[in-house]
Amino acid sequence: MFKNEQNFSSYFLLSAILSISILQGELVFPGNGILINYIHVLFEWEQESEAEHYEIQISESSNFTSTVVQADKQTLVYIEKDALDWDKTYYWRIRPVNNNGISGTWTDSYSFSTGSPLSESNTTFSNPSDIQNGITVFGAFFNYFSAAIDQSGKEIWNSGSENIV
């Protein structure tokens, strides 16, 4: 198979590089540079070898000098429902932590932007004890959009530029 030692060395080095790049996890969602029309955001990443859990950071600055979210997760997903807002650009990254508590290196960061809210709805609660968990989805026929609000009346999703009612 190998005609000389140099071919074997080249093959071995290439195999090692490919193995390392395949084993290192990658950020999956939200994808780099995308615009989303919701502020309850699912973050997903690929598994990294020997990771017991992951640290995730979300920041408004690309150098992560301050973070809006810093969390530890034992899964490959994280849902942020409170800290993100409309009309902002965010950066996110993860790093694995092994069972000895040793942190790996941070992944390259991805950025994403949140669109603008479309609803001008206001919520008034006459009896706060009647509030139930969940979301309310509605359509606005005059402006041709759909949106969802959470139990506190905060818009968390909209149809963006799509005219769906």
Task: Locate predicted features.
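Bacterial N-terminal signal peptides that target proteins for export
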Residues: 2-12
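Bacterial N-terminal signal peptides
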Residues: 11-21
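Pro/Thr/Ser/Gly-rich low-complexity, intrinsically disordered linker/stalk tracts
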Residues: 24-49, 86, 108-119
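Short proline/glycine-enriched turn/loop motifs at strand-loop junctions of beta-rich domains
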Residues: 48-52, 141-143
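Recognizes extended acidic, P/S/T-rich segments that occur
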Residues: 53-87, 99-110
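Histidine-/acidic-rich catalytic cores in large beta-rich domains
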Residues: 97-165
